[in-house]
């Protein structure tokens, strides 16, 4: 009776040690936007011990600057619907200080029109384009562009703002070596 419980505990404890699984390169169409692509850092998001996704942050020179173009590459480990992606993003943007209901509704609709449902192994790649907005790609194609600089800044702040809900993931993305679970 105790053996199954110990096995589950062992699996949950061993999971955080697993290597972050992000590709070593960005798709050429994405990298062309930056001209050169160097990884800044990478990390893993866990929620209640479950692996949700691995993420990598890329820039032109391997250093993140909030006012320069960069790429956030997410490789999902779970099924997530378009609605879940949009709702979670809006909840986080709201938590970080945006309360304008009209603006949030517009951004929610834009994400629902851009993001696909994702399955384990799928990539969702976002490009931050200062003063212009954001572009989103899968591993193989452009998904869409949201030409709203404020949306882009607020969306990527979910991961990169110092007030993020996952500071360990932020530290890892910015090149730190902290745990990300």
What are these regions (language model features)?
Residues 1-6:
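Bacterial N-terminal signal peptides that target proteins for export
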Residues 13-17:
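N-terminal signal peptide c-region/cleavage motif recognized by signal peptidases
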Residues 19-181:
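Terminal leader/tail segments of proteins
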């Amino acid at each position: 009776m105790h053996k199954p419980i110990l096995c589950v505990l062992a699996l949950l404890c061993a999971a955080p040690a697993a290597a972050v699984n992000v590709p070593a390169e960005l798709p050429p169409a994405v990298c062309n936007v930056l001209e050169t692509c160097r990884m800044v850092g990478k990390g893993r998001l866990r929620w209640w011990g479950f692996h949700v996704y691995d993420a990598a942050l890329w820039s032109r020179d391997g250093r993140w600057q909030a006012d320069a173009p960069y790429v956030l590459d997410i490789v999902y480990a779970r099924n997530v619907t378009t609605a879940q992606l949009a709702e979670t993003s809006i909840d986080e943007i709201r938590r970080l200080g945006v309360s304008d209901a009209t603006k949030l509704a517009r951004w929610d609709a834009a994400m629902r029109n851009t993001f696909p449902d994702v399955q384990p192994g799928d990539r969702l790649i976002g490009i931050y384009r200062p003063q212009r907005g954001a572009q989103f790609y899968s591993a193989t194609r452009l998904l869409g562009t949201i030409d709203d600089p404020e949306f882009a800044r607020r969306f990527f702040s979910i991961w990169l703002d110092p007030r993020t809900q996952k500071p360990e993931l932020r530290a890892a993305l910015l090149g730190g070596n902290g745990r990300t679970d």
